[in-house]
Each structure stands twice: as C-alpha cells, then as structure tokens.
Amino acid sequence: MMSASTMAKVMILMLAVCLLTQADGKPVKKRAVSEIQLMHNLGKHLASVERMQWLRKKLQDVHNFVSLGVQMAAREGSYQRPTKKEENVLVDGNSKSLGEGDKADVDVLVKAKSQ
C-alpha cells in the first residue's frame, strides 16, 4: 500500500500535468467529421446495401424465370406497342384548334386572373 507522502507526490504531479496541458477537458484536436455526419453516412450506407440486396433478389428471380423457360404473360392495362403498322394511327377525335377553349376552361382562367 502507498504511504501518504507518496500519494501526495503523485497527486501534485497529476495536478501539475493537468495545469500545464491547459486542455480544460476539451479534446486536444478537433475532429474532422462530427458524430452526426458519421451516423448520417452510416444510414445512407445501410440504405444503399438494403437496395442492393433487394435488387440482387429481384434479378435472381428474373434469372430463375428465364432459366426455367417460363413465359411471362403481359399484364392487363400495361402499355404494349401496336403489332401492326395500321394500328398505329392518330385519332382525330378532338376538333378544337389551338387557342380555343371550353367554357369551363375560360371560367377557370377568369377566376384565376381576378385573384
């Protein structure tokens, strides 16, 4: 066990070291990146990893369908290109010329201008 005089010498030495360094309890060097920025970067990284895993899973599913030779049916309501050139015709159902408007369109414009 330490004697009282040895303990006093150690305490005086520690006090001298603390006073001479003048750190005041603050870190000696400032950090280049704050903890908040590190946590933000970690969150972005985890989201990116999660997206990559999801994409890998989806691509693996597509690869499995292709390797098994499964024919995928077209979904109803999805866009499909016309198979024949004749089907790709513009519809002339709108007889309005440019600048012409319906009564409802004019009413909306008048109300918008008055405000």
Curated annotation (Swiss-Prot):
GO terms for molecular function: hormone activity; parathyroid hormone receptor binding; peptide hormone receptor binding; receptor ligand activity; type 1 parathyroid hormone receptor binding. One of its GO terms (biological process) is response to ethanol. It comes from Rattus norvegicus. Residues 76-101 are annotated as: Disordered. It is found in: Secreted. Interacts with PTH1R (via N-terminal extracellular domain). Residues 1-25 form the signal peptide. Belongs to the parathyroid hormone family. The keyword Secreted applies. GO terms for cellular component: extracellular space. Keywords: Cleavage on pair of basic residues, Hormone, Secreted, Signal. The gene is Pth. PANTHER family: PARATHYROID HORMONE. Residues 51-69 are annotated as: Important for receptor binding. Parathyroid hormone elevates calcium level by dissolving the salts in bone and preventing their renal excretion. Acts by binding to its receptor, PTH1R, activating G protein-coupled receptor signaling. Stimulates [1-14C]-2-deoxy-D-glucose (2DG) transport and glycogen synthesis in osteoblastic cells. Pfam families: Parathyroid. Hypothalamus and parathyroid gland. InterPro entries: PTH, PTH/PTH-rel. Residues 26-31 form a propeptide. This is Parathyroid hormone.
